[in-house]
């Protein structure tokens, strides 16, 4: 039986935006198992210089990531879409175990199977050291980014 993860391709502006917000909310949960279920069992990723294949490697990667990137908060924004592909830009804030804060900026290219599961994720990311006073993502970590929180564009990022 095929797993379905609506919305399904081909995407419209509305359904692509729903997919982006769903991915943001999933990643902000910092739950590797939950996040991995949005991807095909054989999903292929390039994240920075790391190559990842399949859900078990996704879970291992995200587990390592969120042990290092503490108080993680992410905002994604739709950049472009066509057919079964979506391009997003994103920024996330986090600190390391020494209390050093960062804002990481990036772009992702996503390709989806007809099931709505992501089959390919290609990400380029750069880290910028910031001070705690420079932080812009301050919502309560117990839930997703509030609907009325400014977008990346609204924040000038």
Language-model features, listed with the residues they occupy:
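A beta-strand edge to alpha-helix "cap/lid" segment located at domain peripheries
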Residues: 1-11, 60-157
